[in-house]
């Protein structure tokens, strides 16, 4: 239970980093990234020691080989210890309550460490002996030891260094004294709370719901203020979802129409029919026109059909010439010209006023039929009539038309100019610049764009002039808006395809290459992956179907793994008579992974027979009679570390009922640390099962599966937390009675167990809760489905939340929710690791675990969380621990959950493929980056603490104060918090872990499998998915703000989380757009090919994933059923969940007897009275126990200690000599050993 300490920057002699078999943490550098700690460059004190006593070694070294820890094996200069070329300045970070390490720093500030000038590990100060402390031990402060043994020397020895940190009182229990607020201070605080300005979110919700005042909502059944606030926040969220959906719909369908409106009628050159006439590049429909009377034209004649010359389909631009515009000054009047002009030099026309063919085939005709200027329409009336005509459309040319060698065409600013029209100039009438002739006769200009050629001012005027007098059409181009819409379309297409393809291929790479690294080298199941997969599929057909028996001897833990054998092993000897029989895989020069047990290699085992010396015990540590007697005879801990422990001064003086003084006679002994049946060092695991209203069959199935896993029982313990005195619907017994009926060999008889107080996760008076702790062993029952030869003895502890006496008569006494059940364990682990004050309940949990396991709870490194209706495959726990041990950066993982009632109804059938794809696609993809965003609470594992830096240094993970503090939040006053903490607490824990430790990993281990029953009624599925979808949305909102996740910008987990959040919010809109697109492609032409291809890829890739990863073709059928049910998954369920944002109840999921569905999280009753809860450190509880007894086990309380001897005649123990002087640790251990003698 040692506090976590900083890692040493120098290389530890017991742990060579250069030969590590597993990936080293990138954060292993001088600065501890997770705590933000930086060693001081110039420490205020030089290192000093009292006396000449050397420093002790690490737990894995021998006593004779002790070397000073402060000695540096690799001397480094002072300059080498500083940070080099780093842009990170963690010391400049503002450490407020939002900082991920805020609470950890507060707890670490109470650590007493000495400064170091060498950069080595800080030394924990001990006033009795200068010893380092393993976090695997439980060290009690020396001041407590002095009080127990009566040592009057409590003053600090001269020359002792003051610990780094704050000035502390003489007592060792250092806490900030809580100061009672006066009435005036409370009043001021209330006033400050009242004048707190509203947030932007609250203002937005008030604006959106202005039409629904509080008085109106009260009339509609919302009397509570919390209900009205939740409803307004719900409307605010729905409005944002609608805005996002509208934006997505606009990008999908409206953006193209907005920026690229459908162009008007466009007529291709040479395809303009006889009902049109062309003027200046535009086509005019003159089919119903009537011309006034003129020479050669009768009244109301149609110029297209009624005249001798048929003008239909011809270009009449010369009849309405654009003169005196850009061409003024360029085209001038020729000498002797008959063209009318005025004083300003304006000309009446430039060309003969006649029509020509649109294909440019007309010959030049400079004559006029009646008079000069005939058909030039120079009068204002004629011009106004022409300008009033509506253009039917533009005449366009393609580039192929422009490059046609039969014509002399060029392009200027998008307009097509026919340079051959310049031949129609009459030299006798007008004069034009020579540049016109040069352009017309230059063959290199033909078919070119002259826009960038004519760049000077004069050239630009020439270009504009040509456009006015010789324009015959426009180039076939798209508008900027249309180009932009296509760019957006293709960029979106590439972007979506990249995400889908990356997700698919990375998930496939994880399944094929990366996942196998997590698995154990050998387990109790078959070593053939295909055969094992088939066994799992058969096993998941029924929830009560037992696991397959071991049929492959080569795959058992006692067999050899052929894949690990080497060809050269048959020629050269690999062992000798001096080789340890427990050593496993020592052929590699690389050190094994670090666990608490591997660091305690000098631990002393129980006296008597050791079942592990004879090889693997097929019954998984079930001892014979002789071994039981040996265990029962021992009255000390099974694992006594060679180091002095934090509790050594107290635990050696306990009474027979204390944690060390009494160990259950059926306790499972601890094997040697070298014993590695699965190819990796074993780690201790707590299997947490949270029970609420489950029935006897469900709980029995879960506990049977955990108890019969092939992981050694010496390294696992079952902890069941019953959430209140609850009776499930249709059950004859309450859940606590059902669970207690599955226990045996109680440490204390159930009727004698007392209820103890603790601080619950709730508000008001419900923060005080009481619970009972039952410790014993799992009982399979007389009608067990488990073969008696397979029944193993597993330590088990049950915590029953029974509630305070005030709520005994109320419904569901003691019920505080699943999060409170998890916090009971998490808070307990934090108190154990930091040696902090604990409640009476936590103290009893400490003693209960010690008595049924024979070891300190600080040895546990991992927590397996399983729901009480889930059944675990036998080797799943082995694979999960294997991943944790092999990669210390993994802080959480989950296995695959399979459905056991696939064919119960259509509701269960549509969920089969959804479960499959969520694991093998989503979680596999996220595991590549180590950022699985959701570890299902029904089957997951978290790391309690992780090795960090040098030997014996650990940092809290699940037991981290920041995790415990945030997860135990009891002020749940906003819609966001309620969806996080009341509906999706399991997912929020995963989110919290990623927020606090963004550089660590959460992965999916496909080898670990469990099965469960899913809802087979639609109303239950609707209620379950409402909770899941709403919690997913709010958890993704939390994660999207974490900037330290793996990757950068679009190639980061933060971006992936953002895409998932948007995708979740627009699910109803997306499925609606999909069906609209399919219908549109059927009834309208042309078919939108690109969106349909994209849709086919998104829906079809999972089928390929099934072929490549699944082991049954039946999943193709399940996929078809899932696709048919897409409207339910993507529309009905999300839309219902969004509308129920303000519903915080569990609905129809797990109802109890007589319960009515109601909204939760809205009412708080009474005030919390903290005086009802006693909190002390473990040593204070033990001293109090000693003070309550006059004489226990030969220890006199009046003298605190006495020398023990036994008489040879009667064998009874007798106190002969009180101890009045300081007793050494060895002497205390000797007395403890004497007390264990029969």
Swiss-Prot record:
Organism: Exophiala dermatitidis (Black yeast-like fungus)
Listed Basic and acidic residues bias regions: 14-34, 175-190
GO BP: chitin biosynthetic process
Keywords associated with the record: Cell membrane, Glycoprotein, Glycosyltransferase, Membrane, Transferase, Transmembrane, Transmembrane helix, Zymogen
Start-end of Polar residues biased regions: 71-80, 133-142, 553-562
Catalytic reactions on record: [(1->4)-N-acetyl-beta-D-glucosaminyl](n) + UDP-N-acetyl-alpha-D-glucosamine = [(1->4)-N-acetyl-beta-D-glucosaminyl](n+1) + UDP + H(+)
Residue intervals passing through the bilayer: 200-220, 235-255, 487-507, 1062-1082, 1087-1107, 1115-1135
Region (Disordered): 1-93, 132-190, 548-570, 582-606
Family of this protein: Belongs to the chitin synthase family. Class IV subfamily.
Enzyme class: transferase
pH dependence of function: Optimum pH is 7.5.
GO CC field: cell septum; plasma membrane
Temperature dependence: Optimum temperature is from 30 to 45 degrees Celsius.
Protein name stated in the entry: Chitin synthase 4
Topology of the protein relative to the lipid bilayer: Multi-pass membrane protein
SUPFAM superfamilies: Nucleotide-diphospho-sugar transferases (SSF53448)
Highest taxon above the source species: Eukaryota
Conditions for induction: Expression is increased in cells shifted from 25 degrees Celsius to 37 degrees Celsius.
E.C. code: 2.4.1.16
Control of this protein's activity: Activity is stimulated by Mg(2+), and is more inhibited by polyoxin D than by nikkomycin.
Disulfide bonds: none
């Amino acid at each position: 239970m040692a506090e976590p300490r900083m890692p040493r920057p120098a290389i530890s002699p017991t742990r060579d980093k250069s030969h590590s078999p597993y990936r080293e943490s990138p954060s292993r550098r001088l600065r501890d990234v997770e705590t933000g700690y930086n060693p001081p460059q110039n420490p205020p004190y030089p290192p000093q020691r009292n006396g000449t006593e050397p420093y002790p070694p690490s737990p894995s070294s021998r006593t004779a080989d002790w070397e000073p820890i402060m000695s540096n094996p690799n001397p480094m200069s002072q300059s080498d210890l500083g940070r080099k070329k780093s842009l990170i300045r963690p010391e400049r970070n503002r450490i407020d309550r939002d900082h991920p390490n805020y609470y950890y720093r507060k707890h670490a500030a109470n650590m007493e460490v000495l400064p170091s000038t060498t950069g080595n590990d800080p030394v924990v100060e001990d006033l009795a002996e200068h010893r380092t402390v393993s976090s695997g031990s439980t060290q009690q402060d020396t001041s407590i030891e002095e009080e127990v043994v009566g040592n009057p020397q409590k003053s600090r020895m001269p020359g002792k260094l003051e610990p780094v940190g704050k000035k502390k009182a003489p007592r060792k229990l250092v806490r900030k004294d809580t100061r009672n607020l006066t009435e005036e201070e409370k009043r001021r605080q209330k006033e400050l709370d009242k004048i707190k300005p509203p947030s932007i979110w609250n203002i937005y919700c008030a604006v959106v719901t202005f039409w629904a005042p509080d008085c109106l909502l009260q009339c509609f059944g919302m009397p509570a203020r919390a209900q009205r606030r939740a409803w307004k926040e719900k409307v605010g969220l729905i409005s944002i979802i609608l805005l996002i959906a509208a934006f997505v719909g606009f990008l999908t369908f409206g953006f193209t129409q907005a920026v690229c409106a459908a162009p008007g009628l466009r007529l291709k050159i040479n395809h303009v029919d006889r009902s049109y006439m062309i003027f200046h590049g535009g086509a005019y429909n003159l089919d119903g026109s009537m011309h006034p009377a003129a020479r050669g034209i009768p009244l109301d004649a149609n110029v297209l059909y009624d005249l001798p010359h048929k003008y239909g389909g011809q270009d009449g631009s010369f009849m309405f010439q654009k003169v005196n515009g850009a061409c003024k000054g360029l085209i001038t009047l020729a000498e002797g010209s008959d063209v009318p002009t005025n004083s300003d030099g304006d000309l009446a026309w430039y060309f003969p006023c006649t029509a020509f063919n649109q294909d440019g085939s007309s010959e030049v005709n400079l004559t006029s039929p009646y008079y000069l200027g005939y058909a030039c329409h120079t009068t204002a009336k004629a011009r106004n009539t022409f300008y009033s005509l509506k253009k039917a459309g533009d005449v366009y040319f393609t580039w192929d038309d422009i490059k046609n060698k039969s014509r002399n065409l060029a392009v200027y600013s998008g307009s097509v100019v026919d340079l051959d029209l310049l031949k129609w100039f009459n030299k006798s009438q007008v004069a034009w610049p020579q540049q016109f002739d040069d352009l017309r006769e230059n063959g290199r200009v033909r078919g070119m764009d002259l826009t960038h050629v004519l760049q000077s001012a004069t050239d630009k005027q020439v270009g504009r002039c040509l456009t006015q007098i010789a324009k015959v059409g426009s180039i076939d181009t798209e508008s900027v808006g249309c180009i932009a819409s296509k760019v957006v379309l293709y960029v979106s297409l590439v972007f979506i395809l990249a995400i889908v393809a990356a997700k698919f291929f990375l998930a496939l790479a994880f399944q094929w290459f990366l996942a196998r690294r997590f698995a154990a080298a050998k387990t109790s199941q078959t070593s053939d992956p295909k055969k094992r997969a088939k066994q799992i599929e058969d096993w998941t057909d029924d929830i009560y179907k037992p696991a397959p028996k071991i049929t492959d001897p080569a795959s058992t833990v006692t067999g050899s793994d052929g894949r690990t054998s080497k060809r050269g092993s048959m020629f050269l000897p690999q062992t000798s008579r001096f080789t340890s029989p427990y050593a496993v895989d020592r052929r590699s020069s690389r050190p094994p992974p670090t666990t608490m047990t591997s660091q305690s290699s000098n631990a002393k085992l129980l006296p008597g027979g050791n079942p592990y010396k004879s090889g693997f015990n097929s019954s998984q540590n079930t001892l014979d009679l002789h071994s039981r007697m040996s265990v029962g005879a021992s009255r000390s801990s099974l694992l006594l570390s060679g180091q002095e422990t934090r509790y050594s001064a107290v635990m050696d003086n306990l009474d027979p009922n204390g944690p060390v003084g009494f160990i259950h006679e059926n306790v499972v002994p601890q094997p040697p640390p070298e014993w590695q049946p699965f190819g990796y060092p074993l780690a201790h695991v707590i299997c947490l099962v949270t029970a609420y209203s489950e029935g006897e069959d469900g709980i029995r199935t879960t506990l049977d599966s955990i108890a019969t896993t092939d992981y050694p029982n010496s390294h696992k313990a079952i902890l069941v937390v019953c959430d209140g005195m609850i009776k499930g619907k249709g059950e004859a017994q309450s859940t606590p009675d059902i669970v207690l009926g599955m226990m045996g060999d109680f440490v204390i008889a159930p009727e004698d167990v007392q209820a103890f107080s603790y601080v619950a996760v709730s508000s008001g008076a419900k923060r005080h809760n009481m619970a009972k702790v039952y410790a014993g062993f799992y009982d399979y029952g007389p009608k067990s489905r488990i073969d008696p030869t397979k029944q193993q003895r597993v330590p088990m502890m049950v915590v029953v939340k029974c509630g305070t006496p005030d709520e005994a008569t109320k419904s569901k006494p003691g019920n505080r929710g699943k999060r409170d059940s998890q916090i009971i364990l998490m808070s307990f682990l934090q108190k154990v690791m930091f040696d902090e004050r604990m409640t009476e309940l936590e103290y009893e949990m400490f003693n209960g675990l010690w008595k049924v396991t024979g070891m300190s709870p600080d040895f546990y490194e991992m927590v397996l969380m399983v729901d009480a209706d889930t059944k675990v495959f036998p080797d799943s726990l082995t694979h999960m621990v294997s991943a944790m041990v092999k990669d210390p950066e993994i802080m959480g993982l989950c296995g695959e959950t399979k459905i056991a009632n696939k064919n119960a109804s259509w509701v269960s059938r549509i969920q089969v493929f959804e479960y499959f794809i969520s694991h093998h696609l989503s979680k596999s993809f996220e595991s590549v980056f180590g950022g699985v965003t959701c570890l299902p609470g029904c089957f997951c594992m978290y790391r309690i603490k992780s090795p960090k830096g040098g030997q014996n240094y650990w940092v809290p993970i699940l037991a981290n104060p920041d995790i415990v503090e945030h997860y135990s939040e009891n002020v749940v006053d906003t819609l966001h918090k309620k969806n996080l903490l009341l509906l999706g607490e399991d997912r929020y824990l995963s989110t919290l872990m990623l927020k606090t430790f963004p550089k660590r990993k959460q992965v999916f281990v496909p080898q670990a499998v469990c099965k469960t029953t899913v809802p087979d009624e639609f109303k239950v599925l609707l209620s379950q998915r409402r909770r899941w979808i709403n919690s997913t949305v709010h958890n993704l909102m939390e994660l999207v703000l974490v900037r330290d996740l793996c990757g950068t910008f679009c190639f980061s987990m933060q971006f992936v989380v953002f895409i998932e959040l948007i995708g979740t919010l627009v699910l109803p809109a997306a499925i609606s757009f999909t069906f609209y697109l399919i219908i549109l492609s059927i009834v309208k032409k042309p078919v939108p090919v690109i969106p349909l291809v994209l849709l086919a890829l998104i829906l079809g890739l999972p089928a390929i994933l099934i072929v490549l990863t699944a082991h049954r073709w039946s999943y193709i059928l399940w996929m078809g059923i899932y696709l048919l049910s897409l409207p339910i998954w993507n529309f009905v369920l999300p839309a219902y969940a969004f509308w129920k944002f303000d519903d915080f109840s569990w609905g129809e999921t797990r109802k109890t007897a007589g319960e009515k569905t109601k909204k939760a999280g809205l009412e708080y009753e009474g005030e919390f009275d903290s005086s009802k809860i006693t909190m002390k450190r473990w040593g204070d509880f033990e001293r109090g126990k000693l003070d309550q007894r006059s004489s226990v086990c030969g220890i006199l309380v009046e003298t605190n200690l006495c020398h023990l001897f036994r008489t040879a005649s009667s064998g009874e123990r007798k106190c002969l000599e009180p101890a009045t002087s300081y007793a050494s640790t060895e002497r205390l251990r000797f007395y403890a050993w004497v007390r264990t003698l029969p």
